[in-house]
Amino acid sequence: MLELQHIGFEAEGKEILRDVSLTINDRFVAVTGPNGGGKSTLAKIIMGIDKPTSGRILFNGEDITYLSITERANRGISYAFQQPVRFKGLRVKDLLKLAAGKDATITAACNVLSEVGLCARDYIARELNDTLSGGELKRIEIAMTLARGTQLSVFDEPEAGIDLWSFQNLIHVFEKMHERTRGSILIISHQERILNIADKIIYVKAGEVEKYGPREEILPALLGAQTAGACKVLTDKLAAGKEGGARA
């Protein structure tokens, strides 16, 4: 489905990604690693928000390296930001109908809101402005991606801001999304519960893919590397996530 060939990216004279080659066609793929390692940049390059300095991107065999965001979306790629964008003047129902396509109904829009734990009656006519919290916007953006039902969905830390909503519900949304699309879901996350549902894990550090393989092989290796210091940032975040879950 998605193939990255020797991807490199530089910004302001700094090398962010170096010779990244990946093939992604599994159900759930998690991307993790230290902060500043290049994870979000990798996701933005897949969506076309950033263009690689070198290398090629293939989607279903087509070279999409220099296609625009809209062109990639039309081919079946969607992206959910770590910090959702506010669209002043645009209502939730309009956003969801745009995401789902011209044949979308209000009923369908209400259904996807319910699936992400929001009461449709309270949110369907709301504007996407400062009256919505970050957590509410995050769930609306997840609902938008669910409504689109693309072949490849990319999520940048989808768990951020959803502390009042069951984490298990988020995982259920991903599973339901896959049932509908039979596509791939790429999730950037530090959460062990996200990593535990992944078919494969990509570990990105200092702009390089240091590890990539089945969860059963990669996750124990990452957790076991704590004493050597190679995975300190990851394990710190996993511990923080567990404490947050216990408080909830």
Q: Where is each model-derived feature located?
A:
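Conserved structural motif at the start of ABC-family nucleotide-binding domains
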Residues: 2, 15-19
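The feature captures the beta-strand-to-loop junction immediately N-terminal to the Walker
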Residues: 32-35
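Helix-to-loop junction immediately C-terminal to a conserved catalytic motif
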Residues: 47
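Conserved ABC transporter NBD signature motif
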Residues: 55-62, 108
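ABC ATPase NBD coupling module
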Residues: 63-78, 222
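Q-loop/switch helix immediately C-terminal to the Walker
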Residues: 83, 89-105
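Walker B catalytic motif
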Residues: 154-158, 165
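Conserved beta-strand-loop-alpha-helix hinge in the C-terminal portion
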Residues: 208-231
